[in-house]
Structure formats: structure tokens, C-alpha cells
């Protein structure tokens, strides 16, 4: 702490005697023989190792924000409606790629697959975003706040030769997320009646 981070415990001990304040030194937190620190967590996230980073945090790494309209490609072309978020510019994000995710909306919890990146297969303006397909979810949540926790890295962001290839890969990613959520969190698909009548308007 202090100028050029020159302060340390020894300095605080001397100052506590000089200025008569009580000093309590908290030992560094360790997990499996390694020190838990924000620097280590940021390093793990920068390498896409979200599972390792999450073990060191009280809550998994998450992106919070309202759901915004996208280009409607997910529902209309790919048959996979997605919830789109635009993170703050200074938000620390892992490498562009696809991640298994857990989504919190109001008091409900869902699972899905999230793409962090710029959607390289889709032509047009590129900007960093988080796009999440929520498993077995059929609600309109535009302009609603959601929390998206990234649980596991699936694959890097890729550019596909066609929208058909992209759609096939997205469905494979979704099935991977379903298996992962079931294996690690006991997730079971929710059965909906009159599904078409309640189909989501997310794009």
C-alpha cells in the first residue's frame, strides 16, 4: 500500500505503536497450496479458465445487465432465440468463445450456452457482446435484468462457412451445456405444455 506500494506489515506494526491503533494481520488465503488473490483470478479469467477462477471466488464470474434487442438472427434464422447483453467497456471478460452458463432471472435459475465475442459469422457492425441461449426457456425478457454466470469454457469463437454450419454447431453447443448442467448441477429439462403459445420473443 502507499506510495509505489512500499508499505508492508512491518511498517504498519511500527505505525500502530506510534499512532496507537490496533493492528490485526489477516493471513493470506490459500487453496490447495496456492495463494488466492485478485491478480491470480484475473489471470485465470484472461486465459479462459473460468472453472479454476470460479473456485477461488465466492460467486462464479458473471455478466449482469439488461437484455437488449439483437439482429433477430437467433430466432428467425438459427431457430435458437438468444438473450443479448452489452457489457460495460471496462468489464473484465474472458477470451472470446463459447461457455456453459447459468442464468438468474428474478428468483429463477436456468442453464444455457453463452457466446462472448463479436459473432464473426454474421455480417455487419462488430461490437463486444454476450449472447446466451437459455435451455428450456420461453419468456420475453427484453429490457429485463439478468445475471449470466460463466461456468465452463466450451470452445473458441469461430467463423463458419454458412449459417447452416453455425446453426448445427450452436445446437451441438446447447446439447453439451445440457449434459454439463445435468452432470454437475442435476439439471433436468422443464416440460412445457402449449409450448408454441408461450414461445419466447428473444432474438
Model features per residue range: what roles?
Residues 11, 40, 52, 162-165:
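An acidic, carboxylate-rich microenvironment
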Residues 5-12:
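Charged helix-capping and loop-helix junction motifs
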Residues 16-115:
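Glycine-rich, Lys/Arg-enriched anion-binding loops that position phosphate/diphosphate groups
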Residues 70-192, 196:
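Phosphate/ribose-recognition catalytic cores of enzymes acting on nucleotide-derived substrates
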Residues 197-203:
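A short, hydrophobic C-terminal helix/tail in secreted or cell-surface proteins
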Residues 1-3, 31:
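Short, small-residue-enriched loops and turns at beta-alpha junctions
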Amino acid at each position: 500500500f502507499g506510495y509505489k506500494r512500499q508499505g508492508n506489515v512491518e511498517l504498519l506494526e511500527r505505525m500502530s505503536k506510534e499512532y496507537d491503533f490496533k493492528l490485526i494481520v489477516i493471513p493470506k488465503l490459500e487453496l490447495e497450496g496456492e495463494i488466492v488473490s485478485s491478480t491470480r483470478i484475473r489471470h485465470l479469467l484472461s486465459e479462459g479458465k473460468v472453472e479454476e477462477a470460479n473456485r477461488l471466488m465466492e460467486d462464479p464470474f458473471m455478466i449482469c445487465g439488461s437484455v437488449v434487442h439483437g439482429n433477430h438472427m437467433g430466432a428467425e434464422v438459427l431457430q435458437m432465440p438468444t438473450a443479448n447483453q452489452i457489457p460495460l467497456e471496462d468489464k473484465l471478460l474472458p477470451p472470446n468463445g463459447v461457455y456453459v452458463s447459468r442464468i438468474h432471472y428474478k428468483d429463477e435459475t436456468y442453464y444455457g450456452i453463452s457466446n462472448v465475442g463479436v459473432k464473426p459469422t454474421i455480417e455487419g457492425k462488430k461490437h463486444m457482446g454476450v449472447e446466451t441461449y437459455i435451455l428450456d426457456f420461453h419468456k420475453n425478457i427484453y429490457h429485463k435484468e439478468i445475471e449470466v454466470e460463466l461456468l465452463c469454457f466450451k470452445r473458441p469463437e469461430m467463423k463458419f462457412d454458412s449459417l447452416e454450419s453455425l446453426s448445427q454447431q450452436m445446437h451441438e453447443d446447447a446439447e453439451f451445456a445440457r449434459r454439463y448442467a445435468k452432470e454437475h448441477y442435476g439439471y433436468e429439462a422443464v416440460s412445457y405444455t402449449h409450448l408454441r403459445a408461450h414461445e419466447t420473443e428473444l432474438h
